[in-house]
Design a protein with these regions (language model features):
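Inter-motif core of Ras-like GTPase G domains
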Residues: 55-78
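Helical hairpin unit composed of two closely spaced alpha helices linked by a short loop
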Residues: 234, 238-241, 278, 284
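Switch II (G3) loop of P-loop NTPases
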Residues: 15, 39-54
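Glycine-rich phosphate/diphosphate-binding loop of Rossmann-like nucleotide-binding domains
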Residues: 197-233
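Short, small-residue-biased leader/transition segments that mark boundaries at the very start
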Residues: 2-5
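Conserved nucleotide-sensing/catalytic segment adjacent to the nucleotide-binding pocket
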Residues: 13-29
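Cysteine-nucleophile active-site neighborhood
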Residues: 248-290
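Internal gly/pro-rich beta-alpha loop/helix module
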Residues: 82-191
Length: 290
């Protein structure tokens, strides 16, 4: 798919909140702008709660503190039980700038297993909100930079199955109650530009790692058109061509076989065309990929 799993699950394009790339004020403004009209805002963390580029700088915990939202932990309970008590206690008390309101356990073997985990929650002072059982029908293999979801994967059926499981074992109503906060973000409306540039962005199964806000900024600078290095035969006329990251290495035969697109890109670059390429997009511009 050309969309992320978070987009598919929500039915709405997600946005990145990144305190390394953006200022604290901009992070708050993004949250306010995109979240104001929503019934529920879910901030999906990355790696561990406190993992950042320098200590907890840039971490999910820092973002939670910046925008003032509570934290629900998702904790792997595989091959453990009461030992989660000190782990939970540490999460709750390690940093006073965030508020841990509950936990959902993953990889729970049985109802009896969950009972041990609930006792640990009581003693650690963290509310147990439910669990996800061990179930092969809701497993997605992981790979570098995310989950392994290809064009053969039926996400709608998978999401329905996950919802069915969660409805039975997670107290969603209580989770939403604990996470209800006053929405206090201020929207600035962003920067308004009236540029007349034409910007072509590569977007298909091979190239789809891009920040939504970057695309919106390009739209304010001019007209944005999308094209597919996999399927299109020619490059759109453009003042700038943007090749975002993705997984071109998974589509090498198709990309290599699209001679018309390859030659069009080469000619554009060699005649002084402006190009922005990131990660997989930069790989595509190389002579070879090994």
């Amino acid at each position: 798919p050309t969309r992320r799993s978070s987009d598919l699950a929500a039915g709405e394009e997600s946005v990145n909140l990144d305190s390394y790339m953006a200022s604290a004020a901009h992070v708050r403004e993004l949250y306010a702008r995109y979240g104001a009209a929503s019934d529920v805002c879910v901030m999906e963390g990355v790696m561990g709660l406190f993992d950042g580029y320098d200590g907890m700088k840039g971490s999910s915990a820092e973002i939670a503190e910046l925008i003032g939202i509570p934290v629900v932990l998702v904790l792997n309970a595989k091959s453990t039980a009461y030992t989660v008590a000190p782990v939970l206690y540490g999460f709750k008390h390690f940093y006073p700038g965030i508020r841990v309101v509950g936990v959902v356990f993953n990889f729970v073997a049985s109802v009896a297993h969950y009972a041990y985990l609930q006792q640990a929650c009581v003693d650690a002072g963290v509310e147990a909100l439910g669990y996800i059982p061990k179930d092969e029908s809701i497993v997605i293999p992981s790979r570098h930079l995310g989950l392994s979801i290809d064009e053969t994967f039926c996400f709608d059926a998978f999401a329905d199955r996950v919802a069915e499981v969660i409805d039975k074992t997670v107290n969603v109503d209580r989770l939403l109650e604990l996470c209800t906060v006053e929405f206090s973000g201020e929207q600035t409306g962003g920067v308004i530009c009236s540029g007349n540039r034409k910007i072509a962005i590569a977007r298909d199964e091979a190239f789809n790692f891009m920040y939504r806000e970057n695309v919106e900024a390009l739209k304010r600078a001019g007209e944005v058109v999308f094209f597919s290095p996999l399927h299109d035969k020619r490059l759109p006329d453009a003042d700038l061509v943007y090749f975002p990251g993705g997984y071109p290495e998974l589509h090498l035969p198709e990309l290599a076989a699209n001679e018309g697109m390859r030659q069009a890109v080469r000619k554009y670059c060699e005649t002084g065309g402006r190009v922005l390429a990131e990660c997989g997009g930069m790989m595509y511009l190389c002579d070879t990929i090994t």
